[in-house]
A protein has these predicted regions:
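Single-stranded nucleic acid-binding surfaces, predominantly the OB-fold ssDNA-binding core
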Residues: 1-117
Length: 117
């Protein structure tokens, strides 16, 4: 597989509309998606586990409309890569992993989102 390292694809629900900000000829879209899955607990009961992932999507201004599908409550699929980043806070270096979105699109509803078949 070509370029199979450091890629992701997740589907979930946008928790709010995308927030955009222009920088010269580029637009930054920031958004978050709630993802979940069903797992079995120790007693064998189904338990829903979920978390929120934050994403950054850079687009040329003329392509910023590709982010229009990111509306609160919409089921979307996000593809991209992880980008390591460093910053300093209170004199201490910190590291984070950013989720960089390269593609985002509406996803058809499933009968049971997050449930593996």
């Amino acid at each position: 597989m070509k370029n199979s390292v450091n890629n992701f694809q997740v589907s979930g629900f946008a928790i709010k509309d995308v927030e955009t900000k222009q920088f010269g000829n580029m637009t930054l879209g920031k958004f978050a998606v709630s993802i979940s899955r069903t797992e079995k607990d120790k007693e064998g009961k189904d338990v829903r586990k979920s978390c929120i992932l934050n994403f950054d999507a850079w687009r040329k201004n003329e392509n910023a409309s590709t982010l229009d599908c990111i509306k609160k409550g919409e089921l979307i699929t996000v593809e991209g890569y992880f980008s390591p980043d460093e910053y300093e806070k209170d004199g201490e270096k910190r590291q984070v992993s950013r989720h960089i979105c390269t593609k985002v699109y509406s996803t058809p509803d499933k009968d049971e989102p997050g449930k593996e078949e």
